[in-house]
Regions:
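A structural motif corresponding to the C-terminal lobe/cap of the Radical SAM core domain
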Residues: 1-151
């Protein structure tokens, strides 16, 4: 949780030999983060990212696109946000794995994406409607211009 990280903690991390931190910020769009039940916002992640950079700690960010409520606009906002952090590496995942008995599995059943009887032993990934065709090409385009971005 970002609010638990401050400059004093980062100083201790550096003293302990920390060289890299993975930031699972998932989205740069606050409504999408709220929909994923994340307890932080993009500005908190930006604050921590800057502190880490100030102390020479490399940062890898994880961007998760296509969840419930995701739109073209929120995807664009997240990509721009991720780019603005100037991270050493960004890992983009499109679609969210559906696990049994979760809020996402209930949404996927309601939307007809999976059946209520699906045991989900074979991985299934939720992708918001309307993004199926557009999202992979958009991510590919962004990654083509950013060699430190992977999927």
């Amino acid at each position: 949780y970002p609010w638990k990280v401050d400059e004093d903690l980062v100083k201790l991390m550096v003293r302990a030999g920390c060289k890299e931190v993975a930031l699972g910020f998932e989205s740069g769009c606050e409504p999408v983060l709220q929909g994923l039940n994340k307890q932080f916002n993009p500005e908190e992640v930006r604050r921590i990212s800057q502190i880490l950079a100030d102390y020479g700690i490399q940062r890898m960010g994880f961007l998760l696109l296509g969840g419930p409520g995701e739109t073209r606009e929120s995807v664009e906002q997240s990509l721009i946000y991720a780019d603005s952090l100037n991270l050493e590496m960004v890992k983009i995942t499109t679609g969210i794995r559906i696990y049994p008995h979760t809020a996402l599995s209930r949404i996927a059943v309601e939307e007809g994406f999976i059946s209520a009887e699906d045991d989900l032993l074979r991985p299934r990934f939720y992708l918001a409607k309307g993004l199926e065709e557009w999202l992979p090409e958009t991510v590919k385009s962004w990654m083509a211009e950013r060699p430190n971005w992977v999927s």
